[in-house]
């Protein structure tokens, strides 16, 4: 996941964690240098981390986590969602949990707030979710659902 023009965040599950590398070109030669690496952070599996400003959000072995990207410091970790999927929609994280639940959590580096939790699908849900306007589409191997998250301001 691109952080800025020179830095990239790499995340991996199975105990690997994450790292930030800086990529640059000097004298016609490309180089990649590791800035930091943290095994216990952002161990994503079946999903990717999301970068928003100077932080990343992601499911670390199923628990939602926020990590500051300059130093690789965990800012918070809370909520169990299994190996689901996460999207950043405006200022909110839309999460499809592994168990088929839909959650909306504020994308706030200081403190997350759960705005909604709703059981939607039954069974293991690993598929990516999609957002079209205020409509959220979720599916797994057995079923598909659409949830309207219309708000007072007509957007998430």
Residue ranges and their predicted role:
Residues 1-156:
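Noncatalytic, solvent-exposed loop/strand surfaces
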């Amino acid at each position: 996941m691109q952080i800025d023009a020179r830095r990239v965040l790499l995340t991996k599950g199975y105990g690997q964690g994450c790292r930030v590398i800086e990529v640059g070109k000097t004298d016609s030669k490309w180089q990649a240098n590791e800035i930091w690496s943290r095994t216990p952070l952002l161990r994503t599996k079946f999903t990717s981390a999301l970068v928003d400003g100077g932080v990343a959000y992601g499911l670390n072995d199923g628990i939602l986590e926020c990590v500051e990207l300059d130093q690789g410091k965990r800012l918070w970790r809370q909520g169990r969602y299994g190996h689901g999927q996460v999207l950043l929609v405006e200022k909110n994280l839309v999460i499809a949990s592994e168990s088929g639940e839909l959650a909306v959590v504020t994308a706030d580096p200081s403190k997350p707030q759960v705005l909604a939790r709703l059981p939607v699908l039954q069974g293991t849900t690993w598929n990516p979710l999609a957002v079209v306007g205020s409509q959220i589409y979720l599916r797994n191997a057995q079923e598909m659902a659409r949830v309207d998250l219309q708000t007072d301001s007509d957007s998430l």
